[in-house]
């Protein structure tokens, strides 16, 4: 559970052993889903007995939708099937990956990379690839070149609220397909699997940058540098680069810029106008450019290595 409010701090492992422990906002019971029958049975039970039903894969939900006080939970984390397929429809023909609802972004990335492909997945490797991530939009460091994760979904295999097992795509159950592709996890149906585009892998250019207000000639020059950054951003996005950046307590940090198909020399060229502006403002900075032969290696270099890394441990 991502937000402590939804845990209700009712049973923290850091409490004294003699302190009372209760479920709080956690669910009362959970079903480890193995297939369609488990989902249908849960839906029928909760409707018959007027019990709240929630869906959980990995629990990465800041809004607490993967838990609920007194609820019955469908835990989809064990649906780990994954395969590369040759997909064909009126809207797309080409390679794709079909994953069970329990597959994490890290697992899907490793599977796709072994065959020379990359996927649009999140920074954190333990976030479930389908379900809440892709159906909620799906932010990624590949968004500038490949769009959101939801843009790449070809079809959903789901169980609806009335217990029907269906496939939703632009060609069949299209309203449900569009609702699932950005409408939020656990809202319209229970996802069993998801099929999404994969993209041919390539060299990945990368860069990092940092500067701060302390070493700037003045606060005004630091603010001018920030304004210059806003103006510079579109030039990165327009060529398919995605910078991850932070501003905090007088510090500006770009820990990573991801640019598919670019070399380290390309990154120097891309950043040259902004670095020239920092020099004009008299602001010292630290800049580094580098590259990786493929996206998985780039991910390991910046956010990994998988399965562990600075963002999360393998779930």
UniProtKB/Swiss-Prot annotation:
MF terms in GO: FAD binding; oxidoreductase activity
Database matches in Gene3D superfamilies: 3.30.465.10
Reactions the enzyme catalyzes: betaenone C = betaenone A; stemphyloxin I = stemphyloxin II
Enzyme nomenclature, EC number: 1.-.-.-
SUPFAM superfamilies per record: FAD-binding/transporter-associated domain-like (SSF56176)
Family: Belongs to the oxygen-dependent FAD-linked oxidoreductase family.
Protein's name in the database: FAD-linked oxidoreductase sthB
Gene behind the chain: sthB
């Amino acid at each position: 559970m991502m937000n402590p409010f939804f845990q209700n701090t009712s049973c923290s492992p850091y409490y004294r052993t003699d302190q009372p422990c209760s479920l709080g906002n956690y669910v009362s019971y959970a079903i480890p889903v193995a297939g369609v029958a488990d989902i249908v049975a849960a839906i029928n039970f909760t409707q018959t007995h007027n019990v709240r039903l929630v869906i959980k894969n990995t629990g990465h939900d800041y809004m607490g939708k993967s838990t609920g006080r007194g609820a019955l939970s469908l835990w989809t984390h064990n649906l780990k099937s994954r395969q590369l397929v040759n997909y064909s429809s009126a809207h797309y023909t080409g390679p794709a990956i079909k994953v069970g609802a329990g597959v994490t972004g890290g697992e899907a990335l490793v599977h796709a990379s072994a065959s020379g492909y990359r996927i649009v997945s999140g920074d954190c490797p333990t976030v479930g690839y389908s379900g809440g991530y892709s159906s909620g939009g799906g932010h990624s460091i590949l968004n500038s070149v490949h769009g959101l994760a939801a843009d790449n979904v070809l079809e959903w295999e789901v169980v609806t609220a009335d217990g029907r097992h269906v496939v939703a795509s632009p060609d069949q159950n299209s309203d449900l397909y569009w609702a699932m592709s950005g409408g939020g996890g656990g809202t319209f149906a229970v996802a069993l699997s998801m099929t999404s585009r994969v993209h041919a892998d390539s060299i990945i250019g990368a860069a990092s940058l940092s500067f701060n207000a302390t070493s700037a000639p003045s606060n005004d020059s630091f603010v001018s540098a920030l304004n210059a950054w806003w103006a510079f951003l579109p030039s990165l996005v327009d060529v398919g680069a995605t910078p991850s950046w932070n501003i905090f307590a007088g510090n500006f940090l770009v820990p990573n810029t991801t640019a598919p198909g670019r070399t380290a020399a390309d990154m120097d060229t891309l950043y040259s106008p902004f670095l020239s502006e920092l020099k004009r403002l008299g602001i010292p900075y630290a800049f580094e450019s580098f590259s990786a032969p493929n996206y998985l290696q780039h991910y390991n270099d910046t956010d990994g290595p998988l399965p562990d890394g600075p963002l999360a441990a393998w779930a």
